[in-house]
UniProtKB/Swiss-Prot annotation:
<protein>
    <recommendedName>
        <fullName>Uncharacterized protein Rv2632c</fullName>
    </recommendedName>
</protein>
<dbReference type="InterPro" id="IPR038070">
    <property type="entry name" value="Rv2632c-like_sf"/>
</dbReference>
<dbReference type="Pfam" id="PF08962">
    <property type="entry name" value="Rv2632c-like"/>
</dbReference>
<dbReference type="InterPro" id="IPR015057">
    <property type="entry name" value="Rv2632c-like"/>
</dbReference>
<comment type="similarity">
    <text>To M.tuberculosis Rv1738.</text>
</comment>
Amino acid sequence: MTDSEHVGKTCQIDVLIEEHDERTRAKARLSWAGRQMVGVGLARLDPADEPVAQIGDELAIARALSDLANQLFALTSSDIEASTHQPVTGLHH
C-alpha cells in the first residue's frame, strides 16, 4: 500500500462518569463500523479511605474500558470463527 492509497479509519469512544454517594460508575461507549458497544465499570469508596474523587473516576473508567475491550475481543473471535469456520485459539488479550 502506498501513501496515496492509505485510508484512515476512526472510531469514537465517549466515557460518561456518574457519582452517587460513595459509588462511581463509568460507561464507555464505542461507536465504530455502524455498531455501538458499551462497557461499564464500577468503583466504590472504602469507608476507611479518604475520599479522592479522581481515584474513583480513574478506576471506574479503567474498568469500563477493560469491559469494552473484552467485548471487542469476543466479537472479533466470533467474526474470525464465522469467517474461517475454525475455532479461534491464538487471540490473546
